[in-house]
């Protein structure tokens, strides 16, 4: 039931849980409201961008690691992969909405960070593996292009030989070095 209850709640109640957690930590004095960053990979990258988009005053910075940002492109990819790998990818239509259904398409547009990027106020570090077949590099490129067109601040880091998550020791060290620099720059005292 918990899994099914998440259907069409990406960017909605699922995101509200993250926001509620952050606000709780602020209220408890655990987190400094002026120095909060959000960092996630894959779906967590989507959640990062949703946080920066739908609650732009909550975060000082965000790190999107191999994250989904274009829900329409995700649907196209799921259709392609569904033909290749079978019905598993059909579940994405239940989770993220069916672009052939006008009501679902409204949800897709409303919850797509790429479509709502104009709301972003904080700097973003975009990290991706050029060989990612799950969330293709085009997601990161489209986000960078959109942020450029909007004059938004972002940094870009792509590992040429990594995929959906980094497994190489050196590329992982390089990535976390970039993360450390980015956070030090944007979460100063």
What is each stretch, according to the model?
Residues 1-189:
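Active-site-proximal cap/loop segments of hydrolase catalytic domains
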